[in-house]
Amino acid sequence: MTATQKAPWFAGKHALVVGMARSGTAAARLLLRHGATVRAIDRRRREDLSSEAMTLEGRGVEVRCGTMDASALEGCDLVVASPGVPADLPLFREAERRGIPIAPEIELGFAVARAPTDRKSVV
């Protein structure tokens, strides 16, 4: 897959990124690059987010600040959890109840990483 090709796992999906620190911001960029529609939420206030996180709005990301409300799950196919976000967040329980998959941010890298073996086995 070249840099301009889109990962079929994300193309056309609606993803919610929970937590907008470095990892969440990077996850949102990766999802955008691979054709997903992205919404991002963070419990911090808008003025407390990094300028890098806020530039995502200009790229089409819907950024919601100061809340972790379950309404952010509307229309989502995937929830991406940033590493610093507590796993017992009520939002995650609601996503599970709705049957929306939750992936740690690092799994996005595994989904798009090229690791060809050229038919060699790995032991």
Feature-to-residue mapping (PLM):
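Walker A (P-loop) phosphate-binding motif
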Residues: E105-V123
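N-terminal leader/targeting and accessory segments in enzymes
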Residues: M1-L108
